[in-house]
Amino acid sequence: XNSQXEXPVA
């Protein structure tokens, strides 16, 4: 999935 908790999206 694509969420703010997944991947380095700071």
Curated annotation (Swiss-Prot):
Misc note: On the 2D-gel the determined pI of this unknown protein is: 5.71, its MW is: 12.4 kDa.
Protein's name according to its UniProt entry = Unknown protein from spot 2D-000JYC of 2D-PAGE
Which organism is the protein's source? Saccharomyces cerevisiae (Baker's yeast)
